[in-house]
Amino acid sequence: NRHYENVRYPDSWEVVKMGEMVRIISGVAYSKSDVTVSGIKVIRGGNIQAGEIIECDDDVYIDNRYADPTNNIYKGDIVLVASTGSQQLIGKTGFATRDYVQTQIGAFLRILRPKDIRCADFLNLFFQSDYYRQYIRSLAKGTNINNVKNSYIEDFVIGLPPLQEQNRIVAITNKIFYMIDEILAGL
């Protein structure tokens, strides 16, 4: 992508396409007649808030015949809003901090499953960045519905530090976010 053409990275960093780092998994399509009071919970766009996957009062459940372990949400997965009418919501992501039992994603979402789970926290930081969101918004524009094509994610080029450096970046960033949360809580 042209935004990275003039970026210089330390020699120890690799320049990789996101498709080398994550596997993209599509969500389940179902009809209203498939909705039940229990079974498999379906995560939808409203469940993705502030970088997290949350429970909602209006969560939907579908019949267990839709069960597919590949489409379950596992710790380290990044859930992406891939189709929506809102430019503000397109591309937003939520990070799975645990396995979600009996839970899959709806058809308008995608799971970005890190190929190396050790990189999950670093990739999550990247997908929370304004840089990523601006990139996605610039590509996903539609007349009514905005869509993130898999190729937008797969072809996106990032700088990837060695694992030890990834962990250091994540630790420092998390510490800063924690301090910000503490300050905001005190206001």
Where are these regions (language model features)?
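Short proline/glycine-enriched turn/loop segments at secondary-structure junctions
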Residues: 32, 100, 144-147
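Short amphipathic alpha-helical segments
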Residues: 5, 108-110, 152-156
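Sequence-specific dsDNA recognition surfaces
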Residues: 19-32, 46-78
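Specificity-determining recognition surfaces
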Residues: 126-158
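Catalytic cores of nucleotide-enabled group-transfer and carboxylate-activating enzymes in metabolic
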Residues: 9-20, 112-126, 135, 155-164
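A short beta-sheet element
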Residues: 44-45, 67-128, 149
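Non-catalytic DNA-recognition/assembly elements of restriction-modification systems
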Residues: 1-28, 159-187
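Short coil/turn segments at secondary-structure boundaries
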Residues: 31-38, 138-140
